[in-house]
Amino acid sequence: MICKNTFVDYPTTQVRKERVHTYRTLTSATPSLEFFSNENTNRLSEVQCKLTHFLSSSENSSSVRNTRTHKFKQLLHYIFFSNRSSSVLGKQNVHNSQTLGSVSFCEKHAIDINYSENVNKQLNFESHLDDQTCSKRFYFNEQSGSDRYSLKCDSDTDSSTYFGDSASETCSSASNSLYKQTDLTSLCMFNQNKIQTDWSSIDPMDNDKIVCADFEKNFNILKELLNNTKDNGIDQQIVHKEHISHLEKIWKNINEESSEDPSLLLLRLEFLLTDLQTAIRKYSDTVSTNSVNEAFFDKIKIELQAFGVLV
């Protein structure tokens, strides 16, 4: 069953108008879902319906439920209408997350990563980032004559980190083993101890094991991406050590929260979205989209099962 009316009823008319305008803009700019078949589109709609029901039945205030539901819909909306043209990506500033370290695809070849400099700030996902939030923009720069590209930081310091050819690895591994799809670890050329989670060996009903494995994997990946890259011949840092320390505190706080918290699901879906978008952006004309999509949906299934949502 496809959910036809799942939008949150916003408190003001102005917000509703803005949402409708954004939706119509993206829909008109993307007449066809070039990377998703009708079957996969229907499956994603069903996931949206089930998670919407799950969020709406949680024991939180209506404002918290609406905020979390809206954020998840923004993620799904981006997946639905993810066209690779720069004009569409320029308009798709809909992934404006509350969470620290969130990823936002605002324009072609650019990622915004927001984080708070106030390390003493209470760590939770229900409060908005305050005025002490700073933002850095990272650009993908393809290296001519090379199979790797860099993530360039648009800031006062000219720092960058080099990544491997992860997109092709993602696509090829997806066709062979859905649950062993190469993730962000393949991006870290300087990471000698790659962290791999054997999804096929994890019981889908073992919620604790799934949650712990995913948290440990993603946190270590982030530490490698944010840490000093001297081993790769680069003396500068993308993010200072105090920000890494702040990230550690937040990750510890996440681990101590209940696995039923929808915010954790949203955070993990951001990693999946980043992984998929990396493959599509780098190889938009040559990727085997069917295998990538199948792997992506199966990984979403695992994530949802950890929260008691069966797909």
Curated annotation (Swiss-Prot):
It is found in: Cytoplasm; Nucleus. It comes from the Eukaryota. Its main location: cytoplasm. Keywords: Cytoplasm, Nucleus, Sporulation. GO terms for cellular component: cytoplasm; cytosol; nucleus. GO terms for biological process: sporulation resulting in formation of a cellular spore. Has a role in sporulation. This is Meiotically up-regulated gene 146 protein. It comes from Schizosaccharomyces pombe (strain 972 / ATCC 24843).
